[in-house]
Amino acid sequence: MLRKALLAVCAVFLLPALLIAQDGKLRGRVTDKESGDPLVGANVTVDGTSLGAAADLRGDYVVLGIPPGVYTIKVSYIGYQPVSISNVRVNAGLTTTQDFKLASSAIEVTALEVVAERPLVQRNTTNTVRLTTTEDIENLPIRGLQNIVALNAGTVQQNGTLYIRGGRSGEVAYFVDGITASNPMFNDSRSENISVVQEAIEEIQLQAGGFTAEHGGANSGIVKTTLKTGGSALRVTVDYRTDDFAKAGEEFLGTTSQGFRNAVLTVGGPVGSKFRYFLSGQHNYMRNRTAAFVDQFNFTTLTDDGLTGRTVGASLPDAVAFKKNFLPGNQRYDNQGQGTFVYNLSNAIKFRLTGSYQHQKFPLGFADFRQALNNLFSGDRPQHLVTKRGLGGLKMTHLINPNTFYEVNVNYTARDSRTFDPDFGDDWLKYSDRREFEKLGYDVSEWQKIFEGPLNYSTIFKFQFTPRNGPINTYSKDSQQSLGAAVDFTSQVNKNIEMKIGGRFDRWTMRAYSVGDIDNALVYLYGSDGNTIRNFPDDYVRRVELASGAVGGINYYGWDVDGINKVNSGPNGPQHPLFGSAYVQSKWEYRDLILNVGLRYERIDAKVLRPANLEDPAFDKSNDFIQEDQLIRTDPYNYLLPRLNFAFPVTANTVFYAQYGKYIQMPNLNDIYRGGTRRLSVDVSTITRSLYGFFNQYVGFTAKPERTDQYELGIRQSLTDNFAFTVTAFYKDLKDQLRFDRVLADGTGRLAAGTPIFVGWINNDFGTAKGLEMTLELRRVKRLAARLNYTLSNTRGTGSDSRSTRVAVSDATISSYPTLIYNLDYNQAHRGTAMLDYRFNQGDGGSILQGLGLNALLTFNSGHNYTKILEPSNLGQASAWTVGTRATQDPRTRNPVEPINSSTTPWNFNVDLTLDKVFKLSSFDLKLYANVLNAFNTRNIINLYETTGTANDDGWLKSPLAAQYIELANYRDFYQAINLDNRWGYYTATGNDVYGAPRQIRFGVSIEY
């Protein structure tokens, strides 16, 4: 027991730093204003904290462990007038330089108070760090953490996914107050998975590669969000904004209302002298959560064609009609909150508690036009998705002396998600049972059998709609929880050298359960009459047979086969991936050289189940089920990752910097864990395994971490007191990227070396990314502030994502794996943003103009690469409604007319605006504002039909093959309405839209007390 306890303690103190130290550092020099002599022993204090330092023999001082925020720094010295500099911003993990020049009390009698300007050139950072502060965020027209991050140079946001410097999706690690907010099950890459109340953010820090040894868990970028801390006085803000000024599908000011309503409340302040708090809460509702261009149409005379078994000529339940820019049944409810609590136990010991919780609910089956159309008549009882996310962390900071401190962190994160029938909840055995529907009063007259619901409606040659009062035939739930601990030790060895050492350990518990075919499972269990109960000889046989894909298609781990009770051990127990790391880092800070040298150790142990013998796994022949006692777990991966960063502050206005580093990241575990022993049995069985990846058959245990080597070189230059630019060049070598590939025999068994066994995730893809980033910043001059971000880049590789090789796997006779790199799907050669902010301060411009401001945000990109393909020469397996996108949906039928990704979609330009007016009232500030997204209502083309190279024609109606269908009544008009006008076929093939979002106008009011 003692040995285990010691091992646990060592693990906590010596393994990885995924929880990032969030405090900043302040340094500078205190001198005599007249002579320039150092003022030895001058007292430097950070107002509102117990932090401070004394100047050394050269007048230099260093203050460690300052929480990010804006402070007033005070300096005093006997015989000199004190100086206070306010508005000094300290950033997480960075060094802020602030020098002081004190005048003798014989020359100046009164204390000097100065308001600091944010430095345009970061002198002490040795890599690309892009900061967005609460002041920057306040006037932006957009909302959402990921949307704000995507404004920076080096980023690409495409189809809702964020890419940084050419890395694949999911290669970004998110942290909130130092707590990891990323989930390794999914490697969150879409904006809805990472959310923070915008009014609670103190700063957002993007490190687009090149991060130092204390940071890990990502191949492409780190996004660190610091939450606000309560101040020395009570502060309350209330914000409400909405566009809900018109009914669904109707317009207000020429713009369709999305039914957007967002309310935010924040409260912060002190309790006594030692405790401070900050709380934020947000309620968000959207009647139409997916803003999309929808051209209205109305078909009132369509009838059933009888091709699903219904009566020929019978009327459909209602007209097939859509209103402009509105998707019915597409609402979303989202409630979340964050809070921080700081307790100063003494001048040396401080505690910080951070918490966050989010509850999100929306119906499934209506997220885009394709889903909304197919489910047009079944919106009365859609399947629901509820997701709950929470995180909490406690950090203790102990200042041993003014130059040394350590931090101890513990944190917990959790995510739970369910897709369920709103009437029956988790009791999925009732989902497809007619008797249960009758009990609730539903009309079941059209049900075919006791476990078989109504037939689909079908019109104009089998375009189908789901029926009313029908069963929901699937159910799923999953959960991920992590418990982590970390220690970081920092010491300012002398005024020039800082040493850091630390480590962290995270243990996850992951569970998943899904039923893919409930009606078949019910027939198998209870017979087609519902009364013939199947008997099983034992629980093992029941579990094996019920999980069969031919029966219920149940995938599970961490729950039993029924999804009722949790299973905590064994091969069907939860997955317990372990992530550990340790680092040592030395930062040398001189006036003309800053050197940051570090070494990081990472250990990743995914513990994936695999058969001991890949060629001939041990199987229960009677059930074709893998022998669970013969399974083993994959071995852990260990890496040493050097990091070297340095900067040359040539002058106060010019800094050169360069960086080299190695990075690793585990691919998302959802694809790797697959679905427990049932899924593994199908994938590796000598009877059912496939060499072609058919029917989603592949193994995940062959995957290992992906690697990146990055190089960076840049210059920061201040041209005037108010204007500066940064130029950065980067190069990335992308290694061991995941792809579908055949797992080959190693020659130690009965099969010859190189013989394919089955398909799995193999780290055989590779690529390169290179680019030039430029940022121009104009500090406010004569009411105008501006910032321009621009990126010129090229990303090439052998695969845009891990599934790019599915064609090569599915038919090796006509396809081959890429051996040469090409432009990837998300490559955007040119991308940028321009932000202009023009505003009148109080007392400026008279009573009408004072407090008035306008923020204009222009975003642009040159489009992304795609491959032109031939139009289909036959229907193949496509329907008369999907044939126009057949080759896009089924890559086996794709016939390119050019090398891969030789073409490019058109340029995109978008303008968002904010107009606001602040009124200073007696005890509070009142702000009225309007946000206008896509101000010119531009139909930006974000994707194209690969057959025609256009956004409004898939080519099918012009094909001679379409003649026989065009003769059908209403076929041409309906095809035009749903496919060419509203992209139903494109959604079906890709899951994406062709156009960006239409204009949205939101009006709001904000009160600050």
Model-found features: residue ranges?
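Membrane-embedded beta-barrel scaffold of Gram-negative outer-membrane proteins
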Residues: 407, 411, 655-657, 661, ...
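Periplasm-facing N-terminal accessory domains of Gram-negative outer-membrane beta-barrel systems
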Residues: 19-115, 120, 182
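Transmembrane beta-barrel wall of Gram-negative outer-membrane proteins
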Residues: 257-364, 384-406, 600
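C-terminal beta-signal and adjacent terminal beta-strands/loops
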Residues: 845-892, 905-910, 916-1009
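Gram-negative outer-membrane beta-barrel transporters
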Residues: 604, 726-733, 744-865
